[in-house]
Amino acid sequence: MHYCNKDIGSFGETIAADYIKNSGYIILERNFRCKLGEIDIIAKDKNFIVFIEVKTRYGYIYGSPSEAINFRKQNKIYKTAQLYIIKKAIHNKFYFRFDVIEVILNTLNSNYSIKLIKNAFQI
């Protein structure tokens, strides 16, 4: 069953959040928004604060989900992360990383696949 893109994205973010919690991450924020943009998930992984972009798709018809994160989108995430770091005054306390989680949904049933790409991009 197909839903609108916003519903698909929200469902994928929930799957991704559960996945990283089960992988030992601590979720600090979900859907952090500011005037510069949005970050889907901000989490702590040991001594890293990780800014995670989640991309959810039905299959690979239009390429892998991570291919949708072009330089412009990366730059927007980076600037939003900078604002978060300043706002929380954590610039000297942690390392920082940008990860991507790809969620591929199955159109026939509730199965899905998930792929975590650590250090997916650097600016």
From Swiss-Prot:
Stored InterPro entries: Restrct_endonuc-II-like, tRNA_endonuc-like_dom_sf, UPF0102_YraN-like
GO molecular function: nucleic acid binding
HAMAP family reported in the protein's UniProt record: UPF0102
Family: Belongs to the UPF0102 family.
Protein name as catalogued: UPF0102 protein CLJ_B2665
Provenance organism: Clostridium botulinum (strain 657 / Type Ba4)
